[in-house]
């Protein structure tokens, strides 16, 4: 006998790729490996990635999150300290060395590439224009690679219009890795209109994961009654995905950290849901949200595959002799 359901039908357009990128995987793995090799506590300067679920999971394993190296107690000065995936100014490792601290730099290799691009511009005599968001840890880290005054932050096309450089013919730009691809292109166009000699970095600064996730959302947003992005409010790449969904045609687009944040009373009647996750959001939260909708709807999953990601960034040599258990790997990969 066929069973019937009184639940309304709902198609979930599930983006792939979504969630953790290679840089996030690597950063989380570094903290877990350090805990297994050296024991707790392992100190982490700033949130290793911008996601509370991940941070709280690492805290439960013995990680201690700090904002300044001066917060490390004297009795734990031999404990490892990990720098977050967003990168740090040059002054931070210098401070760690001055304090005789053992540090592990979990800066995403693609962020490190931007640092090198900025330094190359300076070596070639160019003033560096950094396209990014003021106050973001990645921007602070990139600006801190060069002497004060060597970098100018450009956040908007209006900033580009106001810019008065000392030498308009000696400019080079780099970008934060997690920006809106479309917004960044507009800022670069505005800069080039005013400064035709503006030099680009040797390679694209916006990372593959940012681009892939934005393209996936753009492809799946048209006609969606609601689009949910799993991510934290302080996650730049997650907030950009919300904006992309709105621009691409989703009726409503929201950022949520957990299923408990879904505003059921505001959703109304929906038949199509778009779903993706920022690069620092674990897959287990995506599963949690799908389960929450299954409780209220007769769900059909429409998997929208727009790219295949094979990138893998190895950890530093000092941690490669440590083996992770299947449970460790599940956490590192966002599945637990």
UniProtKB/Swiss-Prot annotation:
The active site is at residue 138. Gene3D superfamilies: 3.40.50.11270, 4-hydroxy-3-methylbut-2-enyl diphosphate reductase, catalytic domain. Binds 1 [4Fe-4S] cluster per subunit. The keyword Iron-sulfur applies. Coiled coil: none annotated. It comes from the Bacteria. [4Fe-4S] cluster binds at residues 21, 108, 207. (2E)-4-hydroxy-3-methylbut-2-enyl diphosphate binds at residues 50, 86, 136, 177, 235-237, 280. It catalyses: isopentenyl diphosphate + 2 oxidized [2Fe-2S]-[ferredoxin] + H2O = (2E)-4-hydroxy-3-methylbut-2-enyl diphosphate + 2 reduced [2Fe-2S]-[ferredoxin] + 2 H(+); dimethylallyl diphosphate + 2 oxidized [2Fe-2S]-[ferredoxin] + H2O = (2E)-4-hydroxy-3-methylbut-2-enyl diphosphate + 2 reduced [2Fe-2S]-[ferredoxin] + 2 H(+). Dimethylallyl diphosphate binds at residues 50, 86, 136, 235-237, 280. GO terms for biological process: dimethylallyl diphosphate biosynthetic process; isopentenyl diphosphate biosynthetic process, methylerythritol 4-phosphate pathway; terpenoid biosynthetic process. Isopentenyl diphosphate binds at residues 50, 86, 136, 235-237, 280. Its EC number is 1.17.7.4. GO terms for molecular function: 4 iron, 4 sulfur cluster binding; 4-hydroxy-3-methylbut-2-enyl diphosphate reductase activity; metal ion binding. Its cofactor is [4Fe-4S] cluster. Keywords: 4Fe-4S, Iron, Iron-sulfur, Isoprene biosynthesis, Metal-binding, Oxidoreductase. It holds the Pfam family LYTB. Pathway: Isoprenoid biosynthesis; dimethylallyl diphosphate biosynthesis; dimethylallyl diphosphate from (2E)-4-hydroxy-3-methylbutenyl diphosphate: step 1/1; Isoprenoid biosynthesis; isopentenyl diphosphate biosynthesis via DXP pathway; isopentenyl diphosphate from 1-deoxy-D-xylulose 5-phosphate: step 6/6. Belongs to the IspH family. Catalyzes the conversion of 1-hydroxy-2-methyl-2-(E)-butenyl 4-diphosphate (HMBPP) into a mixture of isopentenyl diphosphate (IPP) and dimethylallyl diphosphate (DMAPP). Acts in the terminal step of the DOXP/MEP pathway for isoprenoid precursor biosynthesis. HAMAP family: IspH. This is 4-hydroxy-3-methylbut-2-enyl diphosphate reductase. It comes from Mesorhizobium japonicum (strain LMG 29417 / CECT 9101 / MAFF 303099). The gene is ispH.
């Amino acid at each position: 006998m066929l069973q019937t359901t009184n639940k309304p039908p709902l198609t979930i357009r599930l983006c792939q790729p979504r969630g953790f990128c290679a840089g996030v995987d690597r950063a989380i793995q570094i903290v877990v490996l350090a805990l297994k090799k050296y024991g707790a506590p392992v100190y982490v300067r700033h949130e290793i990635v911008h996601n509370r679920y991940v941070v709280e999971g690492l805290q439960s394993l013995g990680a201690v999150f700090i904002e300044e190296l001066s917060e490390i107690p004297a009795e734990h000065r031999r404990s490892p300290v990990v720098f977050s995936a967003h990168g740090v100014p040059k002054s931070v490792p210098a401070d760690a060395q001055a304090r005789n601290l053992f540090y592990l730099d979990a800066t995403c290799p693609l962020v490190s590439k931007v640092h090198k691009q900025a330094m190359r511009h300076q070596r070639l005599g160019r003033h560096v224009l950094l396209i990014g968001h003021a106050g973001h840890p990645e921007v602070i880290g990139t600006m801190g690679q060069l002497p004060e005054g060597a970098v100018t932050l450009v956040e908007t096309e209006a900033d580009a219009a106001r810019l008065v450089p000392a030498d308009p013919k000696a400019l080079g730009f780099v970008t934060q890795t997690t920006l809106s691809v479309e917004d960044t292109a507009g800022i670069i166009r505005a800069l080039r209109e005013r400064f035709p000699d503006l030099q680009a970095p040797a390679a694209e600064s916006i990372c593959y994961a940012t681009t892939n996730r934005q393209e996936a959302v753009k492809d799946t947003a048209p006609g969606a009654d609601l689009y949910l992005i799993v991510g934290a409010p302080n996650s730049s790449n997650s907030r950009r995905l919300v904006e992309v969904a709105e621009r691409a045609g989703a009726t409503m687009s929201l950022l949520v950290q957990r299923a408990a944040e879904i505003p059921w009373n505001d959703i109304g009647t929906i038949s199509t849901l778009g779903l993706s996750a920022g690069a620092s959001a674990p897959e287990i939260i995506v599963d949690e949200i799908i389960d929450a909708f299954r409780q209220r709807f007769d769900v059909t999953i429409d998997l929208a595959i727009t790219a295949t990601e094979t990138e893998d960034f190895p950890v530093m040599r000092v941690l490669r002799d440590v083996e992770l258990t299947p449970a460790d790997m599940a956490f590192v990969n966002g599945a637990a």
